[in-house]
């Protein structure tokens, strides 16, 4: 469970170099971390910097079985998406015998997997210069699923499958055309492919991009 800002300030003892920089106030935003190409190895870093803005949604819950010497053990496998709806999104998976524990693990992993998402107005039909869509066409793949995201004019909405919509919305994308290949019924791959496509938005980076995030 995430700590309140006060509890985080009092109880969090950073174990990594980046964590110490964050708590000491020498790093004040996630953008700084990514600009310096530093790793996020503690979920508390994300809580500390954008915790109040962070939202999470569970997009897939499955009961899976594991064979052991003692027989079959049932566990929940959960996929969670987190984001601040303003340029940052993460996807995480968690497994546990109790659903609540699996969700908590997934949220923790999603924070460790958080990425910046470059937004813009890449559609020739719009040209409003507002960060409402993707700036150019991007592709992502996971397993058999491939997702292609194309810029859409303002007011189009998210033309995508339900699982992909969650990732896009929490990333702060409001308008996009999406095209898919493969078995999108496999939710975990559909979500990861969308996430991987958004990763590509920072394939081409200029210093000005960080100021706009």
Swiss-Prot record:
The keyword S-adenosyl-L-methionine does not apply. One of its GO terms (cellular component) is cytosolic small ribosomal subunit. One of its GO terms (molecular function) is rRNA binding. Residues 54-117 form the S5 DRBM domain. GO terms for biological process: translation. Keywords: Ribonucleoprotein, Ribosomal protein, RNA-binding, rRNA-binding. Pfam families: Ribosomal_S5, Ribosomal_S5_C. Belongs to the universal ribosomal protein uS5 family. With S4 and S12 plays an important role in translational accuracy. The N-terminal domain interacts with the head of the 30S subunit; the C-terminal domain interacts with the body and contacts protein S4. The interaction surface between S4 and S5 is involved in control of translational fidelity. Part of the 30S ribosomal subunit. Contacts protein S4. This is Small ribosomal subunit protein uS5. It comes from Hyperthermus butylicus (strain DSM 5456 / JCM 9403 / PLM1-5).
């Amino acid at each position: 469970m995430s700590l309140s800002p006060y509890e985080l300030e009092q109880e969090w003892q950073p174990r990594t170099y980046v964590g110490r920089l964050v708590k000491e106030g020498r790093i004040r935003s996630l953008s700084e971390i990514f600009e310096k190409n530093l790793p996020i190895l503690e979920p508390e870093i994300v809580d500390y910097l954008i915790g109040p803005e962070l939202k999470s949604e569970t997009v897939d819950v499955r009961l899976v079985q594991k064979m052991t010497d003692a027989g079959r053990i049932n566990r929940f496998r959960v996929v969670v998406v987190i984001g601040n709806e303003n340029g940052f999104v993460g996807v995480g998976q968690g497994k546990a015998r109790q659903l609540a524990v699996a969700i908590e693990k997934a949220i923790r992993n999603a924070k460790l997997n958080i990425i910046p998402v470059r937004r813009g107005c890449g559609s020739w039909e719009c040209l409003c210069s507002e960060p409402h869509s993707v700036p150019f066409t991007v592709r992502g793949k996971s397993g058999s699923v491939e997702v292609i995201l194309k810029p859409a004019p303002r007011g189009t909405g998210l033309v995508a499958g339900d699982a992909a919509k969650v990732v896009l919305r929490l990333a702060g994308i409001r308008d996009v055309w999406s095209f898919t290949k493969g078995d999108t019924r496999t939710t975990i791959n559909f979500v990861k492919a969308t996430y991987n496509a958004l990763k590509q938005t920072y394939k081409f980076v200029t210093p000005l991009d960080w100021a706009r995030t």
